[in-house]
Amino acid sequence: MRLLVFADLHLDAPFAWADPEVAQARRRALRRCLVRICELAVAQRCDALCCAGDLFEQDRFTPDTAAFLRDTFAQIHPLPVYLAPGNHDWLGPASLYRQVEWTDNVHLFESSALEPVTLADGFTLWGAAHRAPANTPGFLDGFAVDRGGVHIALFHGSEQGELVFQESGKVPHAPFRAAQIPAAGLHHALVGHFHTPRDAAAHTYPGNPEPLAFGETGERAAVVVDVDGSGAVARRRHRVAGTEVHDVTVGLDGVAHASQVRDRVAAALAGLTGTARVTLAGEIAPDVDLDVADLHEVAPHLDAVVTRLGRVNVAYDLDVLASEPTVRGQFVRDVRDAADLTDEQRRRVMVTGLRALAGRRDLEVR
């Protein structure tokens, strides 16, 4: 039995970090990714295509997206498509899933409890749906298979032992423990929700197949899962992302003027494709007018550049400044003598005050 599994595509995602034009381009990229996934399922001669939830954003989908999904899955007919709604594409009365007249190769899991579908003689797929955007209990709680053969689960949930591997702030929807999978009589679980890919002994998180945010790790892929008659699985990840998202840190030590900042950022981004987030860090001269807005056009070959300040320090000679018979000198002396400030607070007050006294606009201190 050969299955292709993906999850967390998030069609119609807002891409709040991008301007409207770039965000729309990213949403088009998500659609192209789904087409590649379907083509891969056909090319790999899979017995079924499985989506483990968050196919789209329920609170943002458009009628055009509904038509796109129907036609995309219809084009691979008669290849079966199994959909297990997650917390972002949860199954409710107003769901996109309810508004589409799907072709007969599409099977939508609708129950909040795992329900069986026979894939072939001796092979059963168990799937379930989130029926609300939050507070969905674990699908494996109290569950046990009730028949012989090989059993695979498809759902959207949070393996509690995986939390240390996943991105911070991820809400544990439909929580479960890996040990519950074999204890329930399942041979393997295909799971969505966590965006970091993970191939564990009893379960697979494919991760989001197309980049959604900065800081993502692991290859953006769909997973071909071969299941033999004993229930053993073999997995192969296939890259399906059409674009790349990069996190780049640019060191600013020794920078004396703004043009050098631009040059360093341009050099760091040369040869990259897609979208990049640049984090600026290091020690710069006091007179450098650092404005991240000036860097957005530094790499026109990229789809977008998002720039942020990391730990940027200003190389003030405080001993020289403290010796001045000026307002600035008195300020430096007062901050140095302030006993109620921690070293970090003193640094921030010093830099902010000196910038303000110089008439600078960039008062934010990291």
Each model region followed by its residue ranges:
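N-terminal active-site segment of His-dependent metallophosphoesterases
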Residues: M1-A67, R147, R347, V351-R366
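Short coil/turn segments at beta-strand junctions that form active-site/ligand-binding loops
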Residues: M1, R45-D47, L79, G149, ...
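Domain-start "cap" segments at the beginnings of catalytic or binding domains
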Residues: M1-V22, R220, D226-V248
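Accessory, non-catalytic peripheral segments of nucleic-acid enzymes
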Residues: G231-R366
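A generic secondary-structure signal
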Residues: R36-Q44, T72, G142, R264-A268
